[in-house]
């Protein structure tokens, strides 16, 4: 009996440490030192790490800010074998950056020469930005000049593109020189810019949908690499990332709208 109790006392610490390790997140490496009473030497027990990536669920989003969120645990190694979510995230972020750049260049109360740079002109050689086929300069605070001397054959197409840019511009032509009067800052002009901002935001959302669709299609093609539950979980995560990006696009639109309307 005494021998049995002694053995139990020796085994008990290691047994408890093992149980404690099982209750910890699988993403941690648990290293416990078991103090043996036999020679007072430390013995180490290591548990292998399993990489895990944590994501918030839509249900968690609905709880509101400042509250604890339920997290989805995705095995990083398993997910990366199917799709690189970080690359998908970068593509979605690039959509946001493109919209912000668009707002800064083309959706401003005061029209500047830079606002005309990326107006797309349909030419015989394809679609080209206006600044590649012309010289754009500021004649005065009320007038922008677009010199088409290098590509005179594109003058008519350039005028059409400027007029249809959505920036409320009415170009006038003198030979190969296009004069673009800068519109006065009226309430109507502000509202037209808001409309343009919404159009550009919708285009950004279209680009985002393409990123989401391409990512999900890639996941669907990997059904032989993972279970249906894993595939479905990854698809939900991609959709959630897209939803978060849409919310960010809407936030930038709201800020821009407030700026334009004063």
Curated annotation (Swiss-Prot):
Keywords: Mitochondrion, Protein biosynthesis, Transit peptide. Responsible for the disassembly of ribosomes from messenger RNA at the termination of mitochondrial protein biosynthesis. Acts in collaboration with GFM2. Promotes mitochondrial ribosome recycling by dissolution of intersubunit contacts. Gene3D superfamilies: 3.30.1360.40, Ribosome-recycling factor. It is found in: Mitochondrion. GO terms for cellular component: mitochondrion. Its main location: mitochondrion. This is Ribosome-recycling factor, mitochondrial. InterPro entries: Ribosome_recyc_fac, Ribosome_recyc_fac_dom, RRF_sf. SUPFAM superfamilies: Ribosome recycling factor, RRF. Transmembrane segments: none annotated. Residues 1-55 form a transit peptide. One of its GO terms (biological process) is translation. Belongs to the RRF family. One of its GO terms (molecular function) is ribosomal large subunit binding.
